Amino acid sequence: MKKLLFSAFITPLALTSTLALSAWEKDESVELDVKAQEALTEFKAVDPEVESFISQSVGYVVIPTVGKAGFGIGGARGKGVLYENGAVTAVVTLTQLSIGFQWGGQAYSEFLFFQDTPSLSNFKRGNYELGAQVSAVAITAGVSADAAFVNGMAIFTHAKGGLMYEASVGGQKFKLEGK
């Protein structure tokens, strides 16, 4: 009898929890999509040439806000979305750990454009890491006209605020959660 009552109580509770969690995850991707679109609009306002990167890409990632801080050891974290064919296909989490001379904090947006299917597929496998040898282009008016895809990728950052001094080494890692 106890087992039957336990099952009758736990089963609906588990189903409700699962449905609530999936609704929460959907809301998260919708909210991130709105913020990503706002960041992309800002990027286009600073440099309209970004449209050429979007049109040449098989997919792109927009991380609207990356928070970065450091004092000897530093880190960064941000969440955004992966777009393929104009639609959100995954939530992307960026994490970074760095060691070296660094002090301060800053916030920025990050944009990754994938020129071809192999580079996008490599990113989507989830074991993708941007090391110290990969550089991002800081967005200023007209900068994307001089930027180019390197190894199938183009990466841009747009400062939102803060001040950080650094001479550090560390890589960015990305984790994807599909819809």
Task: State each model region's role.
Residues 1-4:
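Positively charged n-region of N-terminal signal peptides that target proteins for export
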Residues 7-17:
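Bacterial N-terminal signal peptides
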Residues 23-179:
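Small-residue-enriched, tightly packed secondary-structure blocks
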